[in-house]
Amino acid sequence: LVYALESKLVDAAVVSTTSPEKPMYPVAKLVFSPEEVLECAGSRYTYAPNLLALREAYELGVNKLAVVGVPCQVSGLRYLQHSTPDIEVAKWYEKHVVFSVGLFCSEVFTYNGLMKYFEEVGVDPSTVEKLNIKGKVFIKTKNGELVMPLQQLHKYERPACLFCRDYSAELADISVGGLASEGWTITVIRTNAGNNIFQSAVKHGILEVNEIDLESKQLRLLKKLCEKKRTRPLPMIRTVFGP
């Protein structure tokens, strides 16, 4: 994304950041510089309404736009682009969104639920510097680090996430996630638009690439998580709506 802005492949990007007024509260943001992208870097574990920034991009007349989001947001973007072709704003999104980056996502948690969880484990949210969830909950604060079991957090999952079947952002141009070894990111190139930008970044020495083995532990894990999420909603649908 930084490379795309620096090389003028895009003029702006839709991302998320955190509110200065509420700890860890995600908000949508339209960014125009590599510096802004880096300032917004980091995982969000409560829902960030990224697509709200599309309206600002439309009103400002951004010519070439990138969009970053989790699978449901990328799906929403595609609906905006293609399901209402006679609406002016849909035509604009289709023409001016140059590429999308999808983030691997199992689920997110409600903001109030996450704040309650921190209260339960004795952590002041305003002191949290980094939160990471990989099988366990890793919390880095100004006062030290905690590693907690994930089970206690599950009850605060966002209900809508239980109906989502897409783990790897299948409709994005490029999908990325932190399943690889330390310092590496698994990247799935899905479209010509995504491939063109990715290969350009590689050509200019921006990205270091290590082709993944089809039998690697990381790829097997990715397939497992995709399959798990693809089948997970079915029991919930039967429970809510009947058999």
Go through the PLM ranges and name each one.
Residues 1-243:
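Iron-sulfur-associated redox domains of electron-transfer enzymes in respiratory
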